[in-house]
Design a protein with these regions (language model features):
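Noncatalytic, beta-rich nucleic-acid-contacting surfaces in large DNA/RNA-processing enzymes
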Residues: 1-168
C-alpha cells in the first residue's frame, strides 16, 4: 500500500467491482490520494481496474449492464487482432462474442469509444444501424445467398455497367 499505492488501489477496487457502492467509495479514496482514474477505453481497458502509468484505468466490467464474459471476449479479441479502429470494426470483430446492442450502447454512454474519435452523440445515432447492417450481412452470408455480382467476373461487371450507362 505504501510503496505501490496505484497497484494496491487498482487491486482493491477490482476486488469489490460487483459492489457499486464500495467501488464508488474506493474510487473517491483513490482520487483523494492524488491518483488519477482514467475513463474506460475499449482499446486500453481490461476486466479489472488496471494500472496505466501513474493512473488507474477504469474497468470495462464496471460498466453497468455488460457481463464479464462479454468483456473477456472483447479483451481476447483485442489481444489476438490488435486495437479496434472504429465502431464498425469493433462490431464486426466482436459479433461472435455475444456483444449486443445494449452492451454497445452502454460502452458509448460510458465513453469507452471516445479514444476512437467522433463523439458520443454521433455513436448513439448510428450504432443501431451499424449493428443491424452487419447482422444482416452475416445472415445473408450464412444462408449462402450471393448476388449475381458476386459470381460475375470482372468483364461481365464492366459489360453491365456499360449497358447501364447507355440505358440512361
Amino acid at each position: 500500500k505504501y510503496y505501490y499505492p496505484v497497484e494496491y488501489m487498482a487491486a482493491l477496487i477490482t476486488s469489490v467491482i460487483d459492489n457499486a457502492g464500495k467501488t464508488s467509495e474506493y474510487i473517491l479514496v483513490t482520487r483523494n490520494m492524488g491518483i488519477q482514474i482514467l475513463p474506460p477505453d475499449i482499446n486500453e481497458g481490461n476486466v479489472g481496474f488496471s494500472v496505466s502509468g501513474d493512473a488507474i484505468r477504469y474497468a470495462l466490467t464496471a460498466i453497468k449492464n455488460v457481463g464479464r464474459p462479454v468483456i473477456e471476449g472483447i479483451v481476447a479479441e483485442r489481444k489476438e487482432h490488435g486495437p479496434f479502429t472504429n465502431l464498425k470494426d469493433f462490431v464486426i470483430r466482436t459479433a461472435e462474442r455475444d456483444v449486443n446492442k445494449r452492451a454497445v450502447e452502454n460502452f458509448i454512454k460510458a465513453g469507452a469509444f471516445d479514444s476512437l474519435g467522433g463523439n458520443r452523440r454521433q455513436y448513439i445515432s448510428i450504432y443501431s444501424q451499424v449493428i443491424d447492417g452487419i447482422q444482416k450481412d452475416r445472415k445473408n452470408n450464412m444462408a449462402g445467398q450471393i448476388s449475381l455480382f458476386d459470381i460475375a467476373d470482372e468483364e461481365d461487371k464492366k459489360d453491365y455497367e456499360l449497358k447501364a450507362e447507355i440505358a440512361f
